[in-house]
Structure formats: structure tokens, C-alpha cells
């Protein structure tokens, strides 16, 4: 099972501590701000409010804040031997092409990357370049579509909000795509339940969950 760190810490020491706890993959959220790729968890709460952005209960009206970084700066602190999950926060195929250029420029081989996103076209661009892609499933309509097998070709996995997952739904999903990733799971008992259901990986902010997943 893959233990995935939901957020990549802002120091190399904290990243190493997560790797020591069992995290094998570090997630970064990549969005494009005025055409520039930026690692950031701050997103508009609704499509009609592009100027207001939030990360949980933190809000900002600023176009860019200090917590938002270039991808290269984040990659520098991820421990050697760990993979990177780029959660692509755009449905623009041109942005996907830019992402491929960024990935190639790092010199890190495709085996060191996963790319998740919602848009089949964007994922197809990334997959065509040889990178592993995950379809991100967060809404009920997306989940129903995945249950019915409405998935893009060539996926390495689907990554699903964990509250949608139980024995029946995991079984149905795995008939269409054998690898199901659950996010974001911070309760150890829930991680144990999901592991017993056969998920292939768990995204978490909890080092105890990373330790458990890495032990499976």
C-alpha cells in the first residue's frame, strides 16, 4: 500500500520526519496563476468568486502569498527515494502540456511521479508522456460515474474521497480499475477499515496512518 503525505511540509526536516514515519509519496497541489504554475492549497470557494481564495478556514484576497511556491523549491526538500504526487488543479489541456515540460525539466524519471486530476483530456496528455495518472473523484456525480465505469483509459489508479468508500463501492470500483486510493484519512481506525477493503493507498496528514499503511 502507498502511504501518501497529503501536504508537503515547508522544511526538509519535517519532510524527512514524514518519510521516516512511512510516507512514500508527497502530494503537491499545482495550480496556474496568471499562467504561472504555483504550488498552493489556496483555491476559490466557488467558480464565480475567483478573487477570493481559501485553504480550509484561511482566506485571502491577495494574488499570491508567501505560502505559495514554485514547484522546484518544493521538490528540493522531498527526501530521496520518495515519489511526488502532483494534484493538478486545472482542467486546461495547455496547462497539462506545461506540466509535462516541468516534469521533464526536473530530470526525475517518470517512476518518481504520479499526477492526479479531474479532466480526462489533461490526464491523457500527461499519460502520453509516460507518467502515471490518477483520476480524482470528489463529488457525488463523479463517484457515480466511476462506479459505472465511466473512466478515462490508461489510468494507473482512481483516487476517491474516503467517505464514499465501503465494501460494496470499493468492490464495484475495482472491477473497473483495480487500484483505488482513498483520501484524506486521518483516523487510524478508518485507515484499518480501508486497508481491509483492499485500497491500494491512503492519503493522510497523520504520521500514525503513514506508519500503519507502510506496514501493510
Language-model-detected regions and their locations in the chain:
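Phosphate-group recognition and catalysis centered on beta-loop-alpha active-site segments
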Residues: 1-216
Amino acid at each position: 500500500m502507498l502511504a501518501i503525505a497529503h501536504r508537503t511540509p515547508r522544511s526538509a526536516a519535517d519532510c524527512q520526519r514524514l518519510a521516516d514515519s512511512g510516507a512514500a509519496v508527497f502530494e503537491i497541489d499545482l495550480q496556474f496563476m496568471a499562467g504561472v504554475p504555483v504550488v498552493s492549497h489556496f483555491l476559490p470557494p466557488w467558480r464565480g468568486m475567483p478573487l477570493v481564495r481559501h485553504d480550509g478556514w484561511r482566506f485571502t484576497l491577495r494574488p499570491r502569498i508567501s505560502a505559495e511556491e514554485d514547484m522546484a523549491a518544493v521538490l528540493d526538500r522531498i527526501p530521496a527515494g520518495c515519489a511526488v504526487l502532483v494534484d493538478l488543479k486545472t482542467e486546461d489541456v495547455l496547462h497539462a502540456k506545461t506540466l509535462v515540460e516541468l516534469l521533464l525539466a526536473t530530470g526525475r524519471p517518470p517512476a518518481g511521479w504520479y499526477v492526479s486530476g479531474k479532466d480526462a483530456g489533461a490526464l491523457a496528455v500527461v499519460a502520453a508522456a509516460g507518467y502515471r495518472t490518477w483520476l480524482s473523484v470528489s463529488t457525488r456525480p463523479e463517484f457515480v460515474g466511476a462506479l459505472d465505469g465511466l473512466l478515462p483509459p490508461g489510468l494507473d489508479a482512481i483516487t476517491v474521497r474516503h467517505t464514499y468508500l465501503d465494501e460494496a463501492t470499493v468492490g464495484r470500483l475495482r472491477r473497473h480499475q483495480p487500484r483505488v486510493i482513498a483520501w484524506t484519512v486521518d483516523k487510524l481506525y478508518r485507515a484499518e477499515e480501508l486497508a481491509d477493503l483492499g485500497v491500494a493507498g491512503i492519503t493522510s496528514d497523520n504520521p500514525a496512518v503513514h506508519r500503519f499503511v507502510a506496514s501493510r
